[in-house]
Amino acid sequence: MFDPLIILYEDLRVALANRSFYQAFKVKPEETEGQHIYDLGNRQWDIPRLRELLEDILPETTSFDNFKVEHDFRDIGKRIMLLNACRIYLESNRTKLIIITIKDITGERKKI
């Protein structure tokens, strides 16, 4: 199974997500695509660390790796996730996108 992936437009609305995202976070495409990332799942994605990432860090760089976010989701419980993201520009239609992959590390233990 692939890691969950979500693609955002520059204004942080969801362009699309992969099947792994929908399964992992128990959401449907019709209630996700076109919505602002912070509004997803009754605002469950309005996470301070995610805001920091999208509003402060990403505008200053083109990508980041292993940005740790912890959050307690209503339907799936507490999750510890590593986010990787990059900004891309599609010249064909002059669209700026943000691609985010999410690795759930909740069950992993620190190696000693």
Region spans (language model):
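Short hydrophobic secondary-structure edge segments in sensory/regulatory modules of signaling proteins
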Residues: 4-5
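PAS-family sensory domains
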Residues: 70-72, 83-87, 101
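Beta-strand residues that line the small-molecule/cofactor-binding core
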Residues: 66, 78-82, 97
